[in-house]
């Protein structure tokens, strides 16, 4: 039986006296849709940040396709694409260039990324805006750009 896409066991994380996560267990198999719901401060973002290596866990294990998110960071990060709530991009560059930058973060050369960037811009209805800056896009277009950014390295897992 193949490893789950995501497996979290006994995950704990504290920020000082605040226990953001206290023994979280999650198992998501490949092909499943999963919703992580909760009120503000429930630890949703902390869980995602631990999975992607932005935050270190205090205790427990976090695996992506059976590989540890800390000891095998590059592999696990390459398998996840995130369409973040916040826009953490350089607002100066055109969105097409930002997608090439994002691909480059994953070691994808520009010539290899070009077909994917073009396809994403077209499929998400952003091809006519490829030279626009993020600040020039509508709210919906900005969300579609975030999705393109999450997909540009062809990850197996998408976190929205």
What are these regions (language model features)?
Residues 147:
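Hydrophobic anchor residue at the start of the ABC signature
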Residues 133-137:
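Conserved ABC ATPase signature
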Residues 100, 104, 111-129:
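Conserved ABC ATPase "signature" region
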Residues 39-43:
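Walker A (P-loop) phosphate-binding loop of ABC-type ATPase nucleotide-binding domains
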Residues 154:
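Conserved catalytic motifs of ABC-family nucleotide-binding domains
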């Amino acid at each position: 039986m193949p490893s789950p896409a995501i497996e979290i066991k006994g995950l704990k994380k504290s920020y000082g006296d605040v226990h953001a996560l206290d023994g979280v267990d999650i198992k998501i198999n490949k092909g499943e849709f999963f919703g992580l719901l909760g009120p503000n401060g429930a630890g949703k973002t902390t869980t995602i940040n631990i999975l992607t290596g932005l935050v270190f866990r205090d205790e427990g294990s976090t695996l992506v396709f059976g590989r540890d998110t800390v000891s095998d960071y590059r592999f696990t990060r390459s398998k996840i694409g995130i369409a973040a709530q916040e826009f953490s991009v350089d607002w100066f560059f055109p969105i097409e260039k930002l997608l090439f930058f994002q691909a480059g973060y994953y070691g994808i050369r520009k010539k290899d990324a070009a077909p994917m960037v073009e396809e994403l811009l077209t499929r998400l209805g952003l091809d006519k805006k490829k030279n626009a800056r993020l600040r020039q896009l509508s709210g919906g277009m900005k969300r579609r750009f975030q999705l393109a950014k999450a997909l540009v390295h062809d990850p197996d897992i998408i976190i929205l």
